[in-house]
Amino acid sequence: MHDNLPQIWEKAINLIKTELTEVSFNTWVKPIQAISLDNETLVLGVPNDFTQGILNARYNTLISNAVKQVTSKNYEVHIVVPSEERVGDTQNINARRSNAQSPIMGNSPLILNPKYTFDTFVIGNSNRFAHAASVAVAESPAKAYNPLFIYGGVGLGKTHLMNAIGHYILANNPKAKVVYVSSETFTNELINSIRDDRNVEFRNRYRNVDVLLVDDIQFIAGKERTQEEFFHTFNALHESNKQIIISSDRPPKEIPTLEERLRSRFEWGLITDIQPPDLETRIAILRKKAQMENIYVPDEVTAHIAKKIQSNIRELEGALIRIVAYSSLTNSEVTVELASEALKEIFTSKPRLLNVPLIKEVVSNHFSIKLEDFDSKKRTRSISYPRQVAMYLTRELTDLSLPKIGDEFGGRDHTTVMHAHSKIVNEINSDSDLKNKLDAIIKELKSD
């Protein structure tokens, strides 16, 4: 770093400040950190890709001119999103990330996300038990709960907790071999190993570890060879007293076409779920996001967003970034009115996300059956009829193909789905009670 860089940058931002509104300056320029300055190039660090894009598009020339005024020299300005260890006083994180990457062979398994730690996880009633279980496993791998199975909808924090477990273990035991992988990557690596006759290398990669974290395990359902390989991998690790952490969008008993021997093993340890966050947790998540990204958003605005968006954390955070961008691009103060304007398309046009687990849940409540009955082989009318109704609704309200719908209902053939759909369509015309019941179910599914 140039010895005078802090002084040069301080003078430059004072000049920049006179050219911008307070909102724009605080949102885009204030978070910038001066990283290095050589004979030709000034490197500036920003907290995220979004900020980088805005600065490059709108403010790069302004920054260059300000630096030129201070130094009487033309510098090329590079705006980057540095790895976490280069921003601020985080030397320990540098060591941890090196260790996090060391056990990962090639470029196949995933690298732990440095932002996903226990410190950045917002705890609420919807995720408190899952968080506590994750901490327990991180503190005592293979001693507390093995395996740990975390399930929940998209964007609720499963991946965050899995990364946090990996980071915590590595921070306390830098020599630990931690591998984090998606089930899709596991499958692709298996296929490649079979093709290239490298089965031994593949098995060593996933069986000679201390901690194995597998994301989205539901995608191995229906893949016989993958399930076979994962079954033996699971056994090898469990017998060696190594920790296994698994995530899914549903509990083991509701994963269609999952082999029973795997299902039973997933249930050996602890199964915990994450629910959509309540209002207080959503507000806390937004405040944490604003703090992490160094952006200012009034409390009444975060409360407004939290009341309007109830689905998942990703949409909450996306709405926050959209509002801040809208504020900057229109040179307007962040207010509730501005937030409503920025998000009006989301609020007015986005329907509730419909999926099979939600449809099953609502139908099971209306017909008083258990969720597992949808995937069972039971053929009594009290079970088969609600199952047909759920298949009909899935066909009508989602974009899933007939074979995929069959998979979601215990691995049934697509012709079974076609029959169920046709049966309900025909009965609607002659059975007013059924039509009224379906209308009530659909209304509940589409309600906020």
UniProtKB/Swiss-Prot annotation:
<dbReference type="InterPro" id="IPR001957">
    <property type="entry name" value="Chromosome_initiator_DnaA"/>
</dbReference>
<dbReference type="Pfam" id="PF11638">
    <property type="entry name" value="DnaA_N"/>
</dbReference>
<feature type="binding site">
    <location>
        <position position="158"/>
    </location>
    <ligand>
        <name>ATP</name>
    </ligand>
</feature>
<dbReference type="InterPro" id="IPR027417">
    <property type="entry name" value="P-loop_NTPase"/>
</dbReference>
<feature type="region of interest" description="Domain II">
    <location>
        <begin position="85"/>
        <end position="110"/>
    </location>
</feature>
<keyword id="KW-0238">DNA-binding</keyword>
<dbReference type="GO" id="GO:0005737">
    <property type="term" value="C:cytoplasm"/>
</dbReference>
<dbReference type="InterPro" id="IPR010921">
    <property type="entry name" value="Trp_repressor/repl_initiator"/>
</dbReference>
<dbReference type="InterPro" id="IPR020591">
    <property type="entry name" value="Chromosome_initiator_DnaA-like"/>
</dbReference>
<dbReference type="GO" id="GO:0003688">
    <property type="term" value="F:DNA replication origin binding"/>
</dbReference>
<feature type="binding site">
    <location>
        <position position="159"/>
    </location>
    <ligand>
        <name>ATP</name>
    </ligand>
</feature>
<dbReference type="InterPro" id="IPR003593">
    <property type="entry name" value="AAA+_ATPase"/>
</dbReference>
<feature type="binding site">
    <location>
        <position position="157"/>
    </location>
    <ligand>
        <name>ATP</name>
    </ligand>
</feature>
<dbReference type="GO" id="GO:0008289">
    <property type="term" value="F:lipid binding"/>
</dbReference>
<dbReference type="GO" id="GO:0006275">
    <property type="term" value="P:regulation of DNA replication"/>
</dbReference>
<keyword id="KW-0446">Lipid-binding</keyword>
<feature type="region of interest" description="Domain I, interacts with DnaA modulators">
    <location>
        <begin position="1"/>
        <end position="85"/>
    </location>
</feature>
<dbReference type="Pfam" id="PF00308">
    <property type="entry name" value="Bac_DnaA"/>
</dbReference>
<dbReference type="InterPro" id="IPR013159">
    <property type="entry name" value="DnaA_C"/>
</dbReference>
<dbReference type="InterPro" id="IPR018312">
    <property type="entry name" value="Chromosome_initiator_DnaA_CS"/>
</dbReference>
<comment type="similarity">
    <text>Belongs to the DnaA family.</text>
</comment>
<feature type="binding site">
    <location>
        <position position="155"/>
    </location>
    <ligand>
        <name>ATP</name>
    </ligand>
</feature>
<dbReference type="InterPro" id="IPR038454">
    <property type="entry name" value="DnaA_N_sf"/>
</dbReference>
<dbReference type="GO" id="GO:0006270">
    <property type="term" value="P:DNA replication initiation"/>
</dbReference>
<keyword id="KW-0067">ATP-binding</keyword>
<keyword id="KW-0235">DNA replication</keyword>
<keyword id="KW-0547">Nucleotide-binding</keyword>
<dbReference type="GO" id="GO:0005524">
    <property type="term" value="F:ATP binding"/>
</dbReference>
<dbReference type="GO" id="GO:0016887">
    <property type="term" value="F:ATP hydrolysis activity"/>
</dbReference>
<dbReference type="GO" id="GO:0005886">
    <property type="term" value="C:plasma membrane"/>
</dbReference>
<dbReference type="InterPro" id="IPR013317">
    <property type="entry name" value="DnaA_dom"/>
</dbReference>
<dbReference type="InterPro" id="IPR024633">
    <property type="entry name" value="DnaA_N_dom"/>
</dbReference>
<dbReference type="Pfam" id="PF08299">
    <property type="entry name" value="Bac_DnaA_C"/>
</dbReference>
<comment type="function">
    <text>Plays an essential role in the initiation and regulation of chromosomal replication. ATP-DnaA binds to the origin of replication (oriC) to initiate formation of the DNA replication initiation complex once per cell cycle. Binds the DnaA box (a 9 base pair repeat at the origin) and separates the double-stranded (ds)DNA. Forms a right-handed helical filament on oriC DNA; dsDNA binds to the exterior of the filament while single-stranded (ss)DNA is stabiized in the filament's interior.</text>
</comment>
<feature type="region of interest" description="Domain IV, binds dsDNA">
    <location>
        <begin position="328"/>
        <end position="448"/>
    </location>
</feature>
<keyword id="KW-0963">Cytoplasm</keyword>
<protein>
    <recommendedName>
        <fullName>Chromosomal replication initiator protein DnaA</fullName>
    </recommendedName>
</protein>
<comment type="subunit">
    <text>Oligomerizes as a right-handed, spiral filament on DNA at oriC.</text>
</comment>
<feature type="region of interest" description="Domain III, AAA+ region">
    <location>
        <begin position="111"/>
        <end position="327"/>
    </location>
</feature>
